[in-house]
Amino acid sequence: MNIYPAIDLKDGQAVRLLRGDMDQATVFNPDPAAQAAAFQDQGFRWLHLVDLNGAFAGRPVNADAVSRILERVTIPVQLGGGIRDMATIEEWLGRGIRRVILGTVALRDPDLVKDACRAFPGRICVGIDARDGHVAVEGWATTSDVRALDLALRFEDAGVAAIVYTDINRDGAMGGVNVEATADLAVHLTTPVIASGGVHALSDLLALKAEAETGIEGVIVGRALYDGRIDPRQALALTAGPEDARC
């Protein structure tokens, strides 16, 4: 199971929000590129970036910070936030982002997601952020009447690389990941699912790994890495598969 350390970008800095509230942002590193390099040095194989300002603005805002991160690391990077048209998708993939995550546009314009999957196979993820089971968009500011599973099923045959599923009520709250909801989503899909929101201890990683057969491919970890609740080496060892043990 992959661990995706998260770098959420707000005003050019690496921050963590509480339940998606931009007014409750804690700055963990004013230099996101240095943070990205540190995660790479710790042994992580992926990075998960979110342009928080972009998610609210509907367009890239922290492009300079993302570019500096890409200059510092060699591991693959996935990026979400403010990516809502084909031109922006093409721009980011051309600049070195391995995968883009489409959230709001997946609800508003599902055909764009399908077109992007055809144009860029294996490089398009769908981000489904749920509040009480319903999809939230526009930087989590608006909650729709669409259920998370119903949205995910729309893309079953589209060639989406992964579904990034976030439980908003758990995000940044350090109350534990919603394993049950994530596994329930994954078991109904053929698309791999990446869990997000609320990871606070190694026990969360073990609980998710125990549900790997449902289709949970990875987990995004944020605040717990920044405040030391999760030790990177222990986390990587716990989630390693047989192929990692042979390395």
From Swiss-Prot:
EC category: isomerase
The answer, when asked if Glycoprotein is one of the entry's keywords, is no
A single GO BP term for this record reads: L-histidine biosynthetic process
Recorded superkingdom: Bacteria
Name the EC number(s): 5.3.1.16
Gene Ontology terms, cellular component aspect?
cytoplasm
Give, as in the UniProt entry, the pathway in which the protein acts: Amino-acid biosynthesis; L-histidine biosynthesis; L-histidine from 5-phospho-alpha-D-ribose 1-diphosphate: step 4/9
Q: Which Pfam families match?
A: His_biosynth
Reaction catalysed by this chain?
Answer: 1-(5-phospho-beta-D-ribosyl)-5-[(5-phospho-beta-D-ribosylamino)methylideneamino]imidazole-4-carboxamide = 5-[(5-phospho-1-deoxy-D-ribulos-1-ylimino)methylamino]-1-(5-phospho-beta-D-ribosyl)imidazole-4-carboxamide
Entry's localization field: Cytoplasm
The GO molecular function terms of this record are:
1-(5-phosphoribosyl)-5-[(5-phosphoribosylamino)methylideneamino]imidazole-4-carboxamide isomerase activity
- Keyword field: Amino-acid biosynthesis, Cytoplasm, Histidine biosynthesis, Isomerase
InterPro entries tied to this protein: Aldolase_TIM, His_biosynth, HisA_bact_arch, Isoase_HisA-like, Isoase_HisA-like_bact, RibuloseP-bd_barrel
> What does UniProt list as catalytic?
8 (proton acceptor), 129 (proton donor)
Give the similarity note. Answer: Belongs to the HisA/HisF family.
Protein name from the UniProt record = 1-(5-phosphoribosyl)-5-[(5-phosphoribosylamino)methylideneamino] imidazole-4-carboxamide isomerase
Q: What's the gene?
A: hisA
